[in-house]
Amino acid sequence: MNIRFSMLVCVSFIFFTGGCAESSANSNDGSKNKNESKEESSEEGVKENDNKLADTPNMDDCIEVYGKEECEQITEYYKSEEGQKELDASETDKYSAKSQTSTTHKDIYEKVSWLVKEMFGVPERTIPADYEKSLVEKRDDGLYYIQSSYEIKGTGNQADTYYEFEMLMDNKYNLIDAYFPGSTGRYSRPMVYDKLKNMEIPEVKKVSPEEEKREEKKREETMKSIYGEEHIKDNK
């Protein structure tokens, strides 16, 4: 494999593993001189390799960028043992990243479930919805938005009650804000975190010592005009 092709393989690895080349047609039939067992083994290997590339889009996309000859070389490379190792490693990395994200969201929801059960003082009768039936999204600001529901089991003649809620939580499992419709207290109103965060806080105007003296003198003159100078002196 010449230097140009090696560099092209490195540059186009993401292109192919991300789905930018089409599976080429089935490999040419093995040599007629090979025995039957070797032919079967070769066919199985080709099928396995084709399956890994089968979900890639049109070969024309690759040809448009790299040219037909080089794209065919790259396709053949990813059918080789070395190319398959790279594809397998890429799939493993994508699976690990997906699992890590899923686990993080589940961890967040486990904390949310615990908070919901403890919030109303009847944890033994409070049943949060399952993670699969809930919405957990990570926002651009790093906070997690949770939308779900819970059920409080009734006692005696009381019926079971069903409620929905939404919540904001950071990655350290701190409750930032929440909204529990029908409840009482702090979280009985819609969430206000975003509204407060986006409010413009007026700038505190700094007053110089000279300005303070002028303001103080103005106040004294006002008091004198109201109560008289003698009254002001007596109260100093």
Curated annotation (Swiss-Prot):
Lipidation (S-diacylglycerol cysteine): C20
Keywords of the record: Cell membrane, Lipoprotein, Membrane, Palmitate, Signal
Signal peptide (residue range): 1-19
Basic and acidic residues composition bias: residue spans: 31-53
GO cellular component, one term: plasma membrane
Organism: Bacillus subtilis (strain 168)
Topology in the lipid bilayer: Lipid-anchor
Subcellular location per the Swiss-Prot or TrEMBL entry: Cell membrane
Name of this protein: SPbeta prophage-derived uncharacterized lipoprotein YokB
Record carries keyword Cell membrane: yes
Lipid sites, type N-palmitoyl cysteine: C20
Superkingdom classification of source: Bacteria
Disordered, as annotated region: 23-59, 204-236
